[in-house]
Regions:
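C-terminal and inter-domain tail/linker signature
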Residues: 1-146
């Protein structure tokens, strides 16, 4: 993570991302409030820690080695925004709203931004912004992609 003052909020964000990177779902869920909301592109809205972990696990199934690295972090009193670079290899099925994309073995690098709101020292809300065409192009799932 980029150098920032280490606060309880920053520590929770690091624990959250590290847990995702390791697919450590109990730790991932422990960083979220019971009524947390997580939103992904394409309309995936996940309510509560269990739904959030199950929803984002779709990406770990498709890209088992998927990891995120925070390259910029901006924090406020109870909010944060992170610029994240996701890297991995498409070795599992990717379930999408329009069907399942079989594994291609292709590597990906996807740039994203994620915004967070906190309640106490836990994540209450997160919204993930990433370019779906960057991901689909990398795995050859766009028309004309080679």
């Amino acid at each position: 993570m980029a150098a920032v003052a280490v606060t309880p909020m920053v520590e929770v964000l690091q624990r959250y991302l590290d847990a995702f990177n390791r697919a450590d779902w109990p730790t991932y869920k422990s960083t979220l409030t019971p009524d947390s909301v997580h939103i992904e592109p394409g309309g995936m809205e996940l309510h509560g820690p269990d739904a959030s972990a199950e929803g984002v696990n779709v990406f770990k199934v498709a890209f088992p080695d998927l990891t995120g690295e925070v390259v910029r972090l901006i924090t406020g009193d109870k909010e944060a925004a992170a610029e994240i670079v996701w890297t991995g290899t498409h070795t599992g099925p990717l379930v999408t709203p329009s069907g399942t994309i079989p594994p291609t073995g292709r590597p990906i690098t996807v740039h994203a931004t994620k915004v967070f709101a906190f309640e106490g020292d836990l994540i209450k809300y997160s919204r993930h912004y990433w370019d779906m065409t960057e991901l689909l192009g990398a795995i050859g799932a766009l028309p004309g992609a080679g």
